[in-house]
Amino acid sequence: MQDYEYIKIRELEKWKLKMKKKPSIINKASKETQNKLNSILPEQYHSIITSAIKNMTKVVLFGSKYTTKTPIINIFIEERDNLAYEKIRLYKKTAMLEGAGTGAGGILIGLADFPLLLSIKIKLLYEIASIYGFDTNDYKERIYILNIFQLAFSSQNHVNDIFKNMENFDFLKETLSNDINDFDWRKFQQEYRDYIDLAKLLQLVPGIGAFVGAYVNNKLVDKLGDYAIYSYHMRLLNSNNCIVEKESWISRQYKYIFNKKIDKKSN
């Protein structure tokens, strides 16, 4: 278990650097292209997407249908990871079948894929949160879920902003507002739409819609699952949270060495 923790801490540090990476020229160009694409998409598409995201956000913040899982406590991080990866595999299969089915149905049925996929993703995040011992009945844990969502499906510039808050979430959560109006869901929905619009648009094309739908949904859920695992590792491996097994000696040694390197660089 000690060796496993050591490996996961190293992987986590690499992932953190990726989240802090500044937008590349390609990232910036892609954002400009997406803005142009938004201007030519049909109004019906924009209306359905905006409505779906708005309703989904309300469900995440206030709904109860996703909060049925009891947080799992007193198991090792490796056991949590195994449970999480099993859930991701299950939800990937579900998303692929859903994407292939709606993609084969033409434009009108294809449009229905967006809210269905949102629901699949949110259910997966609730499952993973409980696996890592967090109670999604807590409104602020739902905010963390939305942050994971944004981290996986946003431009790099927005990822940088979101990650700053997530990295110290357990210290900042006590200062978070309980008012839904303080959450920037406009930015949330626009970033998500911009991230997947092109792929979802291709899903509406006759002949290739089913293949694109299955492939894209599989990739999106896979990425979300990985980001969720890293996001909860960041809280469990970086804290003395009581739901985590006692921190191993090798983990403490790695953190000590890593922090010493950081101190030297800063000096």
Model-derived features: where do they sit?
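Structural signature of FAD isoalloxazine-binding scaffolds in flavoprotein oxidoreductases
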Residues: 118-124
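Terminal, membrane-proximal amphipathic helices
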Residues: 1-98, 126-267
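Transmembrane alpha-helix interface/packing and boundary motifs in multi-pass membrane proteins
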Residues: 98-111
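Hydrophobic alpha-helical membrane segments of integral membrane proteins
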Residues: 110-118, 212
